Regions:
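Amphipathic alpha-helical interaction segments
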Residues: 51, 109, 155-159, 163
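DHp/HisKA dimerization-phosphoacceptor four-helix bundle of two-component histidine kinases
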Residues: 23, 54, 130, 159-166
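Basic helix-turn-helix/winged-helix DNA-binding cores
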Residues: 1-104
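Generic structural signal for well-ordered, non-membrane alpha-helices
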Residues: 33, 57, 86, 90, ...
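Heptad-repeat amphipathic alpha-helical coiled-coil interaction surface used
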Residues: 125, 132, 136-139, 146, ...
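Amphipathic alpha-helical dimerization/coiled-coil segments
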Residues: 93-140
């Protein structure tokens, strides 16, 4: 019987592990290689091997991944092949489609979502369009606030607006 616990809020690294397992079954060691600093996904989101295994245990406890098979190994412990459960696959699809709410998350979480979506061979445009809308609204709010700001507040708002416009332009390029 699979044990489940009330799912805690998943961190981007947990989502990365879940997305990779929704893409195809894998062993923990293979996941750690993809998420290593020089790995395909690690270029965007790096996770040390112990953190990958911790994410695996947390995702398994939440009922989002399961063991597909376990095979003995000549070297070290048995190899456990893992995959996303149906609930895990649905959760990761929803997460991948959801734009980030803050510009500060564009460099990390948004880029991670884009890389994982691309890696899975899916169209980036739905996420890019949703993210463009969020960033456009944020840019409008910051522009309105900047009209009445002065001093230090204006300095900060100009920086935030520049960052927002750069992120907006980046996702707009993905829509072309």
């Amino acid at each position: 019987m699979e044990k489940t616990a009330a799912p805690r809020t998943l961190l981007p690294g947990d989502w990365a592990v879940l997305a990779l397992l929704a893409e195809q079954p894998a062993h923990g060691f293979a996941l750690a290689q993809v998420l290593a600093e020089d790995g395909e996904v690690g270029q965007v989101w790096t996770m040390p091997r112990p953190r990958v295994y911790r994410a695996i245990e947390d995702l398994r406890s939440a009922g989002l991944i399961e063991t597909v098979e376990t095979t003995p190994s000549d070297r070290g412990p048995a190899r456990t092949l893992l995959a996303a459960t149906p609930a895990g696959a649905v959760a990761v699809e929803q997460w991948l489609a959801r734009p980030v709410a803050h510009v500060r998350d564009a460099r990390s979480e948004l880029l991670l979502k884009l890389v994982l979506t691309h890696r899975a061979g899916r169209d980036l445009r739905p996420l890019a369009a949703a993210q463009h809308g969020v960033l456009e609204q944020l840019a409008d709010r910051l522009t309105a606030q900047l009209e009445t700001a002065d001093g230090q507040r204006a300095l900060v708002l100009r920086f935030r607006l520049a960052q927002t416009l750069a992120a907006r332009d980046y996702v707009a390029d993905l829509l072309r």
